[in-house]
């Protein structure tokens, strides 16, 4: 997952029809912090920082829309989709519970200026690396806009660990230290100014740590895994590195006050957009990934199409490859369709950047087709002209809120 490709989904269950901030537990972690000054402006990270982990949320029961998997010894195993859906349900329940228990934020005197400086820096980074999305965030309320910037920057920094200039030096222990630092951040002990912006965000909104930890798990997977036996394995990877972004954003962006959508359905739509984006990344970057020795395509589906890793590394576009790619693109589009249903349920200010993101990313699939499925030597991209056309289209569609049919997780 290239850092420059991080595309945020902006679904939210947060506060319906209002701009009041949810505030953390009664002891208000931020008010307990010592006054500190942060001067760390770089995206890259010092990992000499650790803390104590937190316990996972208690399991909840809810109908599951995925199939079970039988392992080689005949035992029934839980599919990746079901595991991810369990996380979705926990996040939805957490939002509902925490919104019922919101309290009044008590900022400590002297911290406002430092936090404004930290958030401004996050906005600058977002503007530099995700210009279209950044413009869309300017329509949001200041509190939501700043929170999304903070989440974006944390995700980008995390992605840089395994995809940036220092990626070859990153070890599992470095990711362990990054996760420990995340836990400190959620406990109100930020290490630098960029951490401070996210630490403040999780005080102001009911953002849970689990999706952040899951993204780090995706980075661990990238260090040790370069093949995926089937779509079940690939689905879990896509959730870790991209679906999590949707779950992080859900408590922040805001739902239309007239929406009848359930919390779970909005989370599902957010998850679907993350999965769709990552599948699109994978299909676009086949050639780039093979040069790194990686194949992010289901091995069993390659075999069914009469293809092998050798064919991928040879990089020749054949009829077998075209047919294989048609099925992969069809799957990605199905996830985009599910995601689009949920965007209609966002409040108007939050719909535009998310819808623009979806329209632009979905066009990458069109470009792969236009390149005759040659994603070995050609990198599909959306031209500036098409991007400029998509932005007003997204804005116009964001003004309309059709009624939503509750989406379910889709796994072709």
Swiss-Prot record:
It is found in: Plastid, Chloroplast. GO terms for biological process: carotenoid biosynthetic process. Signal peptide: none annotated. Keywords: Carotenoid biosynthesis, Chloroplast, Isoprene biosynthesis, Plastid, Transferase, Transit peptide. Pfam families: SQS_PSY. Monomer. This is Phytoene synthase, chloroplastic. It comes from Oncidium hybrid cultivar. The gene is PSY.
């Amino acid at each position: 997952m290239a850092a420059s490709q991080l595309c945020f989904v902006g679904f939210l269950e947060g506060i319906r029809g209002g701009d009041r901030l949810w505030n953390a537990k009664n002891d208000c972690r931020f008010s307990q912090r010592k006054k500190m000054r942060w001067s760390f402006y770089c995206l890259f990270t010092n990992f000499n920082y650790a803390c104590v982990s937190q316990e996972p949320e208690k399991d909840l029961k809810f109908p599951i829309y995925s199939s079970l998997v039988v392992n080689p010894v005949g035992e029934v195993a839980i599919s990746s989709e079901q595991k991810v859906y369990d996380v979705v349900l926990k996040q939805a329940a957490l939002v509902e519970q925490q919104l019922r228990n919101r309290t009044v934020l008590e900022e400590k005197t002297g911290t406002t200026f430092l936090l404004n400086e930290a958030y401004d820096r996050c906005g600058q980074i977002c503007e530099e690396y995700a210009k279209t999305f950044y413009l869309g965030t300017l329509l949001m309320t200041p509190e939501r806009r700043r929170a999304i910037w903070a989440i974006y920057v944390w995700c980008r920094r995390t992605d840089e660990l395994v995809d940036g200039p220092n990626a070859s030096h990153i070890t599992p222990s470095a990711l362990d230290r990054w996760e420990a630092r995340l836990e400190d951040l959620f406990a109100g002990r930020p290490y630098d100014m960029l951490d401070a912006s996210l630490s403040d965000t999780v005080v102001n909104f009911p953002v849970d740590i689990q999706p952040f930890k899951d993204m780090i798990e995706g980075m661990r997977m990238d260090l040790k895994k370069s093949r995926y036996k089937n779509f079940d394995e690939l689905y879990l990877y896509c959730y870790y590195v991209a679906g999590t972004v949707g779950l992080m954003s859900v408590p922040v962006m805001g739902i239309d006050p007239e929406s009848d959508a359930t919390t779970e359905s909005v989370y599902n739509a957010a998850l679907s957009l993350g999965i769709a984006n990552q599948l699109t990344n994978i299909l676009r970057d086949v050639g780039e990934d093979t040069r790194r020795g990686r194949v992010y395509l289901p091995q069993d589906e390659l075999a069914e199409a009469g293809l092998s890793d050798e064919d991928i590394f040879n990089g020749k576009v054949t009829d077998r490859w075209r047919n294989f790619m048609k099925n992969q693109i069809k799957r990605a589009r199905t996830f985009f369709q599910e995601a689009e249903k949920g965007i209609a349920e966002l409040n108007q200010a939050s719909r535009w950047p998310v819808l623009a993101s979806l329209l632009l990313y979905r066009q990458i699939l069109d470009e792969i087709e236009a390149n005759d499925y040659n994603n070995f030597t050609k990198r599909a991209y959306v031209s500036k002209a098409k991007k400029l056309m998509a932005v007003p289209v997204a804005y116009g569609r964001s003004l309309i809120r059709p009624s939503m049919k509750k989406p379910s997780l889709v796994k072709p």
